[in-house]
């Protein structure tokens, strides 16, 4: 796996992501500064990590979405390249037009930092093949603006096309208001674009890949990506 991790001013999860990718793939990811106008040759996965790019000024991800490197990411995605955006990365992908919708302030107007449960909705995508459909995983969240919203037509299209890959749920896999930590429409935690090659998700799977963290449920996402890329090579 030859991954490229984007680095913006204010991003603070780039090294967490690099460590996770290194542990799973055995390869050193490239760190790509926001002012670059191209991606490293041979890149097979672009990661937009979490943090607070540009201090979240204007809107979360709004400034980063207009950085020079994002033009290269849009071109890369248009050609079918895999793109993963986590937390602020999800916000950046929405602001850049690579994913529909917007991430709004959490319904309870509080920053949420804790482990949550997610239900994997399907297992036949590059981003979920490391899991089983219906599997419940535990991963951390750390966000103040994770409330995914879109117009009703967009939500229905996402649901109808099976583009909701991860959904907030209880430990038993029940999707209800009590388990919806931030008020997201349809308890949406992660979605893909219409081609299925761009994923945005609010939770942080990169922080649950080692035994020392008490949970390794995040490994499935990265292991699945590695398997997909190995098979495609």
UniProtKB/Swiss-Prot annotation:
Subcellular location: Cytoplasm
Source species, domain of life: Bacteria
Enzyme Commission designation: 6.3.5.3, 3.5.1.2
Catalytic activity: N(2)-formyl-N(1)-(5-phospho-beta-D-ribosyl)glycinamide + L-glutamine + ATP + H2O = 2-formamido-N(1)-(5-O-phospho-beta-D-ribosyl)acetamidine + L-glutamate + ADP + phosphate + H(+); L-glutamine + H2O = L-glutamate + NH4(+)
One of the record's GO molecular function terms: glutaminase activity
Membrane-traversing stretches: none
GO biological process terms on file: 'de novo' IMP biosynthetic process
Annotated Gene Ontology cellular component terms: cytoplasm
Keyword match ATP-binding: yes
Keywords per UniProt: ATP-binding, Cytoplasm, Glutamine amidotransferase, Hydrolase, Ligase, Nucleotide-binding, Purine biosynthesis
Domain Glutamine amidotransferase type-1: 3-233
Subunit structure comment from the entry: Part of the FGAM synthase complex composed of 1 PurL, 1 PurQ and 2 PurS subunits.
Role of this protein: Part of the phosphoribosylformylglycinamidine synthase complex involved in the purines biosynthetic pathway. Catalyzes the ATP-dependent conversion of formylglycinamide ribonucleotide (FGAR) and glutamine to yield formylglycinamidine ribonucleotide (FGAM) and glutamate. The FGAM synthase complex is composed of three subunits. PurQ produces an ammonia molecule by converting glutamine to glutamate. PurL transfers the ammonia molecule to FGAR to form FGAM in an ATP-dependent manner.
Protein name as it appears in the record: Phosphoribosylformylglycinamidine synthase subunit PurQ
Source organism of this protein record: Bradyrhizobium diazoefficiens (strain JCM 10833 / BCRC 13528 / IAM 13628 / NBRC 14792 / USDA 110)
